[in-house]
A protein has these predicted regions:
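Short glycine/serine/proline-enriched coil/turn segments at secondary-structure junctions
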Residues: 203, 381, 399-400
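Short, intrinsically disordered, charge-balanced linker/junction segments flanking boundaries
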Residues: 13-19, 413, 426-433
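C-terminal structured domain segments across diverse proteins
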Residues: 406-407, 432
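Right-handed parallel beta-helix
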Residues: 309-320, 332-346, 355-369, 383-398, ...
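Asp-box/WD-like beta-propeller blade repeats and closely related beta-sheet repeat scaffolds
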Residues: 376-378, 412, 416
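Short glycine/acidic-rich loop motifs that flank beta-strands on beta-rich extracellular proteins
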Residues: 59-60, 322-327, 345-352, 368-374, ...
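Bacterial Sec-dependent N-terminal signal peptides
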Residues: 1-21
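Extracellular polysaccharide-degrading/modifying enzymes targeting complex plant/algal/animal polysaccharides
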Residues: 28-329, 335, 342, 350, ...
Length: 433
């Protein structure tokens, strides 16, 4: 029997560089200490050593216009963590409101807890009527693991029975017949906001759409807006609902599910946010310890590296953040090596422009969108940027953006209507898995 041996080799560099002094930091100094050290190091070329522990960030760390180079290194691999989650100890309360109790699933009666988001300075706007992904929507974390947003069904999908109206009108979206009787339980939820996520027209593009009406007598669902339609008409790319290969009635295999609904919290760890009350509801995980519960709500990047050269970051774990991780913009010969990215719910790492930047020997897991998005070079003049993406390990990405979120995306662009082009010239991607 043949065995496959995989070696992920950390990319190390001399620390400190010859002639550099070392600025040593502890977790108690937090992001202010890191920012102050960066400003000092950018002037005299010092190296920064982060001692083991959790560094809680309340705003972005900025490295701007630094031309002398800085090395930022964690003392021990996996022991230095930059994170952005808020602890929720002491914030959970029993549900007392009678109307809310009446909505709770039988499995969660007397168990479900609530958090008043206004008490922790979080305000969550309603979802838009139509979206491709949840944006600026907080995420609960327990023991450094993402807790699942309430969903029906808990696993798998619902399927449209038959499409009655593909495109809708100016006033509403398409209409379809459903099969699962659970829909009847959601009629009263429509008033305060009910959203379905589905692969309405093609099986590789998910849309989340607000529901205008559920008719339990006719067993129909009507969307509030059309999907890739205009004024109730197709825009020319087989918009609307129902498989574009089986018009007008659809294939009966179009997948969808409901999420963020109080009525469907029925398993430990599930949660939702009620936009009207601005309260979060949670079915506590098994063997629950509130010291391990936290929430992420800030969307600013963890680190911005802008117009800078020779910035090197090694042995740091970036974790528990709603926004992007590290952004490298118009920079030269920067290196991110031997780092871990976990529970970063935007893009974990972005390179925009610049030249000869390296992303090497990092781990990525539970990423909301893309692990690495990289662009650069000049396509018209065939000038290479020479960025390198090498020896990285990817698991579980596209956790929030369910489609068009690869491990590595080359060029900055959006798909579908209004394609935006970007440069991806002379980028090497090799030995990743």
């Amino acid at each position: 029997m043949k065995h496959l041996l995989i070696l992920l080799l950390a990319c190390t560099f001399s620390f400190p560089s010859r002639g550099q002094s070392i600025i040593q930091l502890s977790p108690l100094q937090g992001e202010r200490g890191i920012q102050a050290a960066i400003e000092k190091a950018s002037m005299n070329g010092s190296s920064i050593l982060l001692h083991d522990g959790d560094y809680i960030l309340h705003k972005s760390i900025d490295i701007k216009n630094c031309k002398k180079g800085i090395i930022i290194k964690g003392k021990n691999p996996g022991k230095v963590q930059l994170r952005c989650d808020k602890p929720l100890k002491g914030k959970l309360r029993p549900v007392k409101d009678t109307q809310t109790k009446n909505r709770v699933h039988p499995n969660a009666q007397g168990i479900i807890m609530e958090i008043d988001l206004s008490e922790i300075g979080i305000n969550v706007p309603f979802f838009p009527d139509l979206m491709k992904e949840r944006k600026n929507f907080p995420q609960l974390i327990y023991n450094n693991e993402l807790l699942p947003l309430s969903r029906y069904p808990n696993k798998g999908y619902l399927y449209m029975k038959r499409v009655l109206d593909n495109f809708g009108t100016n006033e509403q979206g398409g209409t379809f017949e459903y099969s699962d009787p659970e829909h009847g339980k959601w009629v009263n939820a429509v008033k305060n906001g009910l959203w379905f996520t589905g692969y309405w027209r093609i099986p590789w593009q998910a849309w989340t759409v607000r529901i205008k009406e559920i008719d339990p007598n006719k067993q129909t669902v009507t969307h509030s807006v059309g999907i890739e339609t205009k004024e109730g008409k197709d825009v020319g790319i087989f918009g609307g609902i129902g498989s574009k290969y089986h018009r007008p009635y659809g294939s009966g295999k179009e997948e969808y599910y409901v999420e963020n609904l109080l009525e469907e919290i029925d398993h430990p760890g599930e949660w939702c946010i009620d936009f009207t009350t601005q309260k979060l509801y949670l079915f506590p995980p098994e063997h629950f310890d509130e010291n391990l519960l936290s929430i992420v709500s800030d969307t600013t990047p963890l680190i911005n590296i802008i117009n800078s050269n020779h910035i090197k970051i090694e042995n740091i774990s970036f974790k528990n953040h709603l926004g992007d991780g590290v952004i490298i913009k118009n920079a030269t010969e920067c290196l991110i090596a031997g780092c871990n990215f976990k529970n970063i719910l935007g893009d974990a790492l972005i390179i925009q422009g610049g030249k000869q930047n390296r992303i090497q020997s990092n781990n990525f897991e539970y990423i909301g969108r893309t692990c690495i998005e990289v662009s650069g070079g000049d396509r018209k003049n065939l000038i290479a940027c020479k960025h390198l993406i090498e020896n990285n390990y990817f698991t579980r990405f596209g956790e929030i953006q369910r489609s068009y979120a690869p491990a590595v995306k080359l060029g900055t662009f959006t798909t579908g209507i209004g394609i935006k082009e970007g440069n991806a010239v002379g980028i090497t991607v090799r030995h990743n898995m």
